[in-house]
């Protein structure tokens, strides 16, 4: 809801470590694949290290995800919209923002065009007083267990970090 700026957002399903096989080349494992109430498919990727071309990674994952969700014979307008949210520890664009929206623009006239693909880059490095930066602080600050602005997120963090039940739940997800 915070990153996509949609208070009414509903996650209909959530699949961690979603494997996409590619018979023609490199396969990939998406960190998280979600289907939203409005039909959009979201891939959330989390990256700590800055050691690769992450924009190409986003493009590749989106292409495989789109190919994976398209049914044979589907018209292109029937393919669900795809959103990739790339969350990093570092400010990839080094412009001092916690959230970047990358849009498709016609260079010649500045018109924004929509092909059903959205990419958002979030980082935990920048504290710009936005809600996104405050949310990222919950994930990175060691003592963020009872935050008033994000009570559900901070309580889930407490569960995973400080209880046996949470550790067991995480182990099941990883397995």
Q: What residues fall within each predicted segment?
A:
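Accessory alpha/beta interaction modules
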Residues: 1-118, 128-130
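Short, charged alpha-helical interaction segments and adjacent helix-coil junctions
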Residues: 35, 42-47, 133-175
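Low-complexity, glycine/alanine/valine/leucine- and proline-rich hydrophobic stretches
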Residues: 106-115, 123-125, 135, 139-143
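Short hinge/gating elements
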Residues: 122-124, 170-171
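Active-site/binding-pocket entry motifs
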Residues: 127-128, 163
